Regions:
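An N-terminal boundary/leader segment
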Residues: 1-63, 294-296, 356, 478-482
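Short glycine/serine-rich loop segments
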Residues: 106-238, 428-449
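A short helix-breaking turn/cap at a secondary-structure junction
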Residues: 1, 194-289, 472-482
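Acidic/His- and Gly-rich active-site-bordering loop/insert found
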Residues: 58-60, 68-141
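Acyltransferase
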Residues: 26-34, 110, 251-254, 277-304, ...
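A short acidic, glycine-rich active-site loop
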Residues: 98-106, 151-154, 409-421
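Short helix-loop capping/hinge segments that flank enzyme active sites or metal/cofactor-binding pockets
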Residues: 3-7, 73-98, 257-269, 318-378, ...
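Short, surface-exposed loop/helix-turn segments at secondary-structure junctions
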Residues: 244, 314, 365, 384, ...
Length: 482
């Protein structure tokens, strides 16, 4: 594979490092962008991470770019997930075939996208996403599957699988991602990245999203310092936000390298529903716990009692299905016509149809159940624990096609997904911050994700501990051979 010197030299430099190159005058924003475009052209075809590009639009922005001290990521190339991140004047499909064919153009920037721009990021495209982000793999009928850079026969995870694959391949140093049930942490686990799901209300979802829902938006990164520095640039409420996370006491970047002190940490290394969990995932948790103990922390075989509730996911079905129904109604507005069954993938259409059997009372009861679950979950931290360590996924990255539309059983994909990722959705319901840390790898060189969960509002503690682990057992030298 023939790269220019700059494209090769900057391939695995993180966002902070690339911004430093621009600020120092060693490279221009346009040169850095062209290097990323070159890598996109060479590396994207086998992995299908980036599905929409606007290279010339980005080049015009890069040509006019003038670095200043307020833009912490000035001139750094960046991509948006093709889901729920409107960028004024640019195409967005949400992984949906009808929006793709209609060439839907976003009318405004979301507040987060505007904050990315204000931070100096040069946005040149979108990353692949499953339709409406409804499954933890990235294989939409509209755009085809995104493949894992570490093993092209495997999934990159989802729903932010395109972003994770692009960062893992070194196309960009970090990329926008979102998480409604694990969709930042799961692809980060599959692709060997940092994936920080922030606290509910940490980052505004204005003007269209609802912070009181399960989903959050942020990014996947290669390094802890990128996650911390980017969070400094984009966190905070917007006008009218219903949920606002506690204000940090100092910049998140200050937590990188800070001593976390001696922490009380619980762990879980089995599947709560009694399903299969890969030996590599179990061993990854145990090895991580040993590492944490060697760093001076107290580790106990303990976890929140809420995780033992095997009926929990069923209690929230009315919410999930109703949210899908609302999403399909929104699709009609975006298309300017009524949505038909042919416009939507079968699983999502079936879920929305299921919502019609639910009443307002069913929905209200699900909201109430989620509130009780949230309080029960958070009580474990209130009782004296600082962190929880779990496998991010119960199995290694799945083969492409494992989770797909099945005409004879449209909702089978959700059951398969639930068995694969039992320990990420609970912390969307509880609203707590959680991070995937790429500490462990199989003998074959496949990443094995570790999830660390903190109390609500404690991203600072996650950053301290993740930074401590990154120093103790570095992963930056690990890169896929594409």
């Amino acid at each position: 594979m023939s790269f220019s010197d700059l494209a090769r030299q900057t391939q695995f430099i993180d966002g902070v490092g690339q911004a430093d190159l621009v600020a120092s005058g060693k490279v221009s924003a346009l040169e850095l962008l062209d290097a990323a475009i070159e890598r996109t052209t060479e590396l994207n075809p086998p992995i299908n991470a980036i599905n929409i590009t606007w290279f010339e639009h980005a080049r015009e922005i890069a040509k006019k770019f003038k670095s200043n001290s307020k833009q912490k990521f000035g001139g750094v190339p960046f991509i948006l997930k093709d889901l729920g991140a409107p960028y004024a004047g640019q195409h967005m499909s949400n992984g949906n075939i009808a929006l793709k064919n209609a060439k839907y153009i976003a009318p405004v920037n979301s507040l987060l996208v505007q904050r990315f721009i204000d931070a100096g990021l040069i946005i040149f495209g979108r990353s692949n996403s499953p339709e409406f982000g409804s499954v933890p793999v990235t294989e939409p009928l509209a755009w085809g599957p995104t493949r894992n850079p570490w093993d092209l026969s495997k999934s990159s995870g989802g729903s932010s699988g395109g972003s994770a694959a692009a960062v893992a391949a070194g196309i960009v140093p970090m990329a926008h991602a979102s998480d409604g049930g694990g969709s930042i942490r799961i692809p980060a686990a599959c692709c060997g990245l940092i994936g920080l799901k922030t606290s509910q209300g940490r980052i505004s979802l204005a003007p269209f999203g609802d912070e009181a829902n399960f989903s959050v938006h942020f990014a996947v990164t290669r390094t802890v310092r990128d996650a911390a520095a980017l969070l400094d640039e984009v966190h905070g409420p917007g006008v009218g936000d219903r949920v606002i996370a506690p204000t940090p006491t100092r910049p998140f970047k200050s937590e990188v390298g800070a001593d976390p002190g001696k922490l009380r940490i619980g762990f879980i290394d089995h599947h709560l529903a009694g399903e299969k969990i890969d030996n590599e995932c179990v061993q990854a948790v145990r090895d991580t716990c040993k590492l944490l103990e060697s760093l001076g922390h107290s580790v106990e075989n303990s976890w929140p009692s809420a995780l033992d509730d095997k009926q929990a996911s069923g209690k929230f079905t009315a919410m999930w299905s109703t949210n899908m129904s609302v999403g399909i109604n929104a699709l009609s507005l975006m298309l300017g016509r009524e949505t038909t069954k042919d416009d939507v993938e079968l699983m999502n259409w079936t879920m929305a149809e299921y919502a019609k059997s639910k009443t307002a009372t069913d929905y209200a009861q699900a909201v109430y159940a989620s509130m009780i679950y949230r309080r029960t979950m958070q009580q474990w931290w209130a009782d004296g624990f600082d962190l929880l360590v779990t496998p991010t996924t119960a199995q290694l990255p799945l083969p492409i096609g494992t989770i797909c539309n099945m005409p004879d059983d449209p909702l089978a994909a959700l059951r398969i997904a639930g068995n694969w990722i039992p320990l990420t959705p609970p912390f969307n319901t509880s609203g707590q911050p959680a991070i995937n840390v790429p500490l462990q790898w199989t003998k074959e060189g496949i990443p094995v994700g570790i999830q660390i969960v903190a109390a609500y509002g404690r991203e600072d503690l996650l950053i301290r501990v993740a930074s401590q682990l990154e120093t103790a057992q570095p992963w930056a030298h690990r890169t896929p051979n594409l």
